[in-house]
């Protein structure tokens, strides 16, 4: 087992009950274009078109052959675009159960599949988009070969679902998905799970299981990659989430695209935090209807540390998100708040009484408690960064855009989520995720 000591389990109130309930009926789903780094869509549908589940909606011009398929049948209700015509979302009004059928295989045939057959079925169904590269966190090219594939079967994000609960309901599909991935490449398939977690595996020669323990970010793919198979400019691995492995197993067993999702609905503003069944790209406001405390709330698709605000054209469950988090907007000002002992406020430093209340869960809000200021290196980054890098120096280079030094310090190993804790504990109120993305784009473009 690999156990990390540095990190932070955020003591946030509203942790979900680890029992799966049926979610509300969903009448709108969408694909969010801005989730896919560097993607430029070539649209295959227009507003008003009827689509089947699994039908191609658009293709990536910059990554030919990579297609994005409909998570449900219905009609294209809207195609939202932002500045410079950036695709924000393709919205489908759900109607009927029409769907496209893909290749299916008998259980005993899965172990004999060729890599070409696996690749073709994943690409045609749109499940190829479940894979992401590291470095750069982009969808791999259809003819690319990874050095390894990392299956993330654990989640240490605040308010997250326990993967063991989700996988237990679909253990056979998870095993089939692992077997299919083992046929996609001859390289290693690293299945990463929490210490002692009951996660099934397969006996394929290239599948290895690893256990991780410790605080967040022990459950992030970036942490797993760093300790097992570090990447670089000339070494690429792929990552995939456990729920997508289940979807792959069902696709190859039934020939039908499975877009079901189990999401954790949690946070201090949720009346009954719990796990809910829904669908990929579901309208978040429909999931949360009647579930929230009547207040000025911020609804987030994903983790409170690294999720996206779910509203307007983005009011949909993200492709790579397995949770919906709800906290209160922090709009009120507090007069001389820094003078008070503040037992109801949490800080990683010893500046509030709440820091010393080890078993207390706090009602966090969106306030950053201060304005923008210079970066202040007082050791907070090192306390939450378990990777063997120099976080203060790396973060400084991200701020100034020094791509050469950032690359030398290990930025190619990282994704936005890997720096979310650094943003949370930053006295200077910097958001390091967008800064990292900007540097990665420059490195990819200029070398």
UniProtKB/Swiss-Prot annotation:
Pfam family, one: NQRA_N
InterPro entries listed in its UniProt record: NqrA (IPR008703), NQRA_2nd (IPR056148), NqrA_C_domain (IPR022615), NQRA_N (IPR056147)
Alphabetized UniProt keyword annotations: Ion transport, NAD, Sodium, Sodium transport, Translocase, Transport, Ubiquinone
Enzyme superclass (EC): translocase
EC identifiers of the protein: 7.2.1.1
Subunit and partners: Composed of six subunits; NqrA, NqrB, NqrC, NqrD, NqrE and NqrF.
Name this polypeptide is given: Na(+)-translocating NADH-quinone reductase subunit A
Biological source species: Neisseria meningitidis serogroup C / serotype 2a (strain ATCC 700532 / DSM 15464 / FAM18)
């Amino acid at each position: 087992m690999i156990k990390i000591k540095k990190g932070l389990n955020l003591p946030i109130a509203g942790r979900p009950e680890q029992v799966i309930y049926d979610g509300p009926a969903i009448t709108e789903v969408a694909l969010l274009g801005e989730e896919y780094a560097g993607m430029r869509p070539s649209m295959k549908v227009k507003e008003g078109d009827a689509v089947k589940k699994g039908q191609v909606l658009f293709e990536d011009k910059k990554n030919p052959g990579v297609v994005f398929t409909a998570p449900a049948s219905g009609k294209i209700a809207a195609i939202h675009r932002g500045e410079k015509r950036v695709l924000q979302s393709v919205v489908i009004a759900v109607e009927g159960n029409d769907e496209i059928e893909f290749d299916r295989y008998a259980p005993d045939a899965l172990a004999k599949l060729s890599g070409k057959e696996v690749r073709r079925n994943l690409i045609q169904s749109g499940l190829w988009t479940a894979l992401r590269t590291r470095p750069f966190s982009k969808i791999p090219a259809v003819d690319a070969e990874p050095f390894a594939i990392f299956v993330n079967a654990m989640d240490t994000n605040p308010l997250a679902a326990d993967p063991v609960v989700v996988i237990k309901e679909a253990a056979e599909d998870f095993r089939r998905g692992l077997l299919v991935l083992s046929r996609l490449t001859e390289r290693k398939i690293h299945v990463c799970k929490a210490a002692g977690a009951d996660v099934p595996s397969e006996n394929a020669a290239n599948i290895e299981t690893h256990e991780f323990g410790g605080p967040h970010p022990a459950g992030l793919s970036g942490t797993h990659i760093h300790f097992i198979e570090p990447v670089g400019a000339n070494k690429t691995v792929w990552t995939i989430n456990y729920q997508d492995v289940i979807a792959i197993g069902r696709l190859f067993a039934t020939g039908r695209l499975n877009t079901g999702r189990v999401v954790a609905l949690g946070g201090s503003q949720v009346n009954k935090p719990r796990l809910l069944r829904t669908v990929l790209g579901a309208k978040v406001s429909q999931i949360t209807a009647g579930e929230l405390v009547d207040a000025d709330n911020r609804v987030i698709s994903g983790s409170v540390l690294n999720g996206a605000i779910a509203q307007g054209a983005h009011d949909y469950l993200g492709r790579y998100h397995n949770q919906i988090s709800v906290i209160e907007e922090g709009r009120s000002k507090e007069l001389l708040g820094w003078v008070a002992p503040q037992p109801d406020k949490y800080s990683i430093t010893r500046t509030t009484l709440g820091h010393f209340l080890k078993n207390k869960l706090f009602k966090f809000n969106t306030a950053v408690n201060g304005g923008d200021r210079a970066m202040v290196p007082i050791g907070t980054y090192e306390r939450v960064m378990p990777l063997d890098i120099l976080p203060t120096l790396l973060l400084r280079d991200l701020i100034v855009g020094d791509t050469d030094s950032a690359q030398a310090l290990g930025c190619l190993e990282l994704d936005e989520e890997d720096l979310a804790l650094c943003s949370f504990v930053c006295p200077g109120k910097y958001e390091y995720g967008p800064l990292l993305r900007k540097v990665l784009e420059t490195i990819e473009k200029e070398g």
